[in-house]
Amino acid sequence: MSDNSVVLRYGDGEYTYPVIDSTVGDKGFDIGKLRAQTGLVTLDSGYGNTAAYKSAITYLDGEQGILRYRGYPIEQLAERSTFLEVAYLLINGELPTVDELTVFKNDITQHTLLHEDVKNFYRGFPRDAHPMAMLSSVVSALSTFYQDSHNPFDEKQRNLSTIRLLAKLPTIAAYAYKKSIGHPFVYPRNDLGYVENFLRMTFSVPAQEYVPDPVVVSALDKLLILHADHEQNCSTSTVRLVGSSQANMFASISAGINALWGPLHGGANQSVLEMLEGIQANGGDVDSFIRKVKNKEEGVRLMGFGHRVYKSFDPRAKIIKAAAHDVLSALGKSDELLDIALKLEEHALSDDYFVSRNLYPNVDFYTGLIYRAMGFPTEMFTVLFALGRLPGWIAQWHEMIKEPGSRIGRPRQIYTGVVERDFVPVEAR
C-alpha cells in the first residue's frame, strides 16, 4: 500500500481509495465509491473521524492548542485586529486594505436598521421568550423582507445578504434583550462603531444614555473575534447542511443559531456560571467541590474544562482570562466568582486526575464572568456567542455554495429496526 492510497479488504475483494492531502493537519481518504463498490457504508457516531468537507477557512490543532483563521494565529488577531476586520478576513480570504475595510464598515453601518414591521414579531413573542428563540425567528423572517436575496448562486445577492446579516444581527440581538426586560427598543446610530452600537442599543434607556467604557468595548470586540469561527462544529455543520439544499443565507444561519442554542454547544458558558454560583452558595469551598467531581458524587460535573477537539489548553481561554481581569478592574468590580474560578483552575491544573484526562480550561470558563460583569443576564450569553460566530457561519456558507460539484447533504444509516411485518387492523391487535 502506497502513501497515496488506502486499501480495504472485504469478502473476496480488495478496494483502493485515494488519500486526500491537507496543507497542514489531518489527511483523509475519499470513500465516495465505497458503497457502490462494496455495498458497505461507514458508521461514525458524532462524526469524530469524518471530514464532511474540504475547507480553507479555519485550522485547529487540538493536540498543540493551535487555532488559525485563514492562516493567521488567533493570538495575533485578538491582540492586533478588530472584529469587523476578522469578519472580512474569514469571508473574503484575505485581510482588507484600508480602503476595503472602510467600504466594508460603511456598508454595514448603512444596513443596521430593521424594517419597522419586524417590531411586530417581538410584540408577538411571549414576555418570557428566550432571546435565542427570538434571534433565530427574526433571522429566518428576514427572508420575507428581502426576497431579492433568495438565489444562493447570484454573487450580488450573496454579498448583499452578507452585509445585511452582519449589520442587523446586533440590532436583532439588542431588541431581543429589550423585549425580555420590557424596555423600549433603541435605534442604531451611524456614528458609532459595531460593538459600541450594540452595547448602546442593549443598555440605553430613554431616561439615560448608555456610554460604554472603552475597556468593555475592546474586551467584547476581542471576545467576538475569539468566537468568530471554529472549523466544522455542530452549528457550522448545520449551516452547511441546510445550505446544501440551496436554502438562502437567512434560513441557513437561522438553523445554525438553533444548533448553537444547545447546552452542549453554545450554552456551556451559562453552565459554568451556574457551577461557580453553586460553589459560592456552598461557602466557596473549592476543595469540597473538587472532591465531589473526582468521586462522582451527586452528579457533580466540572464545567468549562475539557473540549471535544482540544487535548491541551484552549488558546482562546488564555486570552479571555486576561480580558476578565481587565474588564473587572475597569468597572471597579471585585467578583467573588472570579476568585473562585481562579482557585478552581489552579486546583484542576495541579491535579493529575484532571491533567491525565486532558481537562484544561476552555473558552467557556471565563466568558460568562465577563458577560456578567458587563451587565448581560445569563439568557443572553449564547446570543453573544451567535453574534461572534456569524462571520464564520457566513464564510462557511459561501465556501460551500461556491464548491464545484457541491451536493445536497444526505447521510446514510445502518437500519436496526424490524425487517418486515404485515399490518394488523386495530380491532385485531
Model regions and ranges:
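Non-transmembrane, aqueous-exposed alpha-helical and coiled segments at domain scale
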Residues: M1-R429
